[in-house]
Amino acid sequence: MNHTPIRTGESFALPPGSSKFTRLFWLATGRTVLVTGAFLLSALGMIAGPLTNPAALAPLSYKADWRWVKGAVFVPTKYVNEAQQWDEYDPVINDRELHYASIYGINCVRVYLHFDIYLKKKNALLKDIEDFLTRADKYSIKTEFVFFDDCWNQPDKDILSADYKYPAPIFGVHNSRWLVSPGENVRQHYAEYRDRLKAYVQDIVNAHKDDKRIAFWETYNEPNQSPETRQLMEDAYDWIHETGTTIPLTATGHDLPDKGFSGDPYSDFNSWHEYSGYNYTGKPDSLCSECMNRSSQTVPGIVEHFKSKTGFILWEFGIGRDNCRFAWGENRKQPRPDETPKPFHGMVYPDGHPWSVDDVKALLGAEAFAKAPLFAVEYYKDSNFAELAKKSVAPMIDFDLGTERGTGSPDASAGVPPENFSVRWRGAILPPTKGTYVFYADSDNQVKLFVNAKLVLNKKTSGHEEISKEIKLAGGQPAEVKIEYVHATGNPTLHISWSGPGLDRQIMTPINNASVQ
């Protein structure tokens, strides 16, 4: 979304109860910058020594090298928006898709929160945030949390009710159910909600104020120019600094004086969004916190452009029910009538395979990709493994696709139909010790599993059922596996797992990249 930059000479009233001594100064560029009392004292020589706490720095004075960031917006593919992501938090799908992200080279995730979910279930939200951070850290992934957002739709009035049902995505409409946070009712009654907004921010920050699993805080995504937004941004800036957190904060700003959003005066460091080409010429102390639309960019192009300049965060990791695979112009007035052959945003489908293997190669690099633990996958447009639609890779076989148009197929962009398709995976596993192993297939339809060319599992009928069988394997020696799945109708579901001596039951993962063997 595009907004008009701050205008020279424009001013606004400071909110009541601001905790810092503040003044507004004009830069030569005509931008308004917030300067804290700490900065004024420092400038006058009244504070000795280095200032390492972000709260003691002037806006945009925090310096870090962000070139390490290879990130992505993280909304699990089963959710229509960021509110549902937390309202119906699912540890299993979060863990699964964080695992995908780590295998594919993502080391930081941008995660949106929502004020209404804090109001609805504060204790559960705080618990789920800790669970998420634990899972992300398990995969060596840093997290940044976004508190507020001015983009897209207003929340439904009954979103706070315990039995609220999130609406289905609107086919052909970009980001069809994404929600602003907070909603207009809160913004228009700011004085009434201010203490609760403060508690929302500080309860989360206080629980993690020195948490090394968090890369930075983001008060506001793509803030517009309204007085309500600026007031909330300044308050949130102060509320976070009041906690004494050692983690820096930002709000979406810009990389050029005449382009972007209004977050710079309320940021410890500059972050901006780049959705048009490859234009950055700045330093690594600014971070591109969103980028990548395939009308003018590619993942390999972004990796190449930013690799020696600064870090980047892709919108987005998953290709799922939030509908960001459709383009900005495909809206409620002009929805796209058919499936897009090229996702506008997103990297990875719900079953774990990327839209383009080249995206993964770019993020990992050729050497790391060649060693990545990935199955080779073939998708067919028929149920007989005859009409090949696509070859790809996947870290595991663990999915429930549902029956919605577009996401009920493992890859609608490649022309795989939601019914009467087939998929084949090949790879190698490593039994840790000699002994008896059990293989499991939890499936809605027909599936075969071969180990070292021997048929071990053979589910011949439709209908959801788990089958299993024991097999003896030598320890420390790779075993070749092949899985063939045929789907007719209904919800495509397949979970392949195994267990054995020294191996608790777990989803089966390969030991090498079968696509390059």
List each model region and its residues.
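N-terminal secretory signal peptides that target proteins for export/translocation
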Residues: 1-29
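Acidic/polar, compositionally biased interaction segments
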Residues: 370-517
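Bacterial N-terminal signal peptides
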Residues: 30-45
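Short, solvent-exposed loop/turn elements at domain surfaces
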Residues: 77-84, 322-323, 385-390
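Substrate-binding cleft of secreted/luminal carbohydrate-active enzymes
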Residues: 292-368
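Active-site mouth of glycoside hydrolases
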Residues: 51-269, 273, 280-284
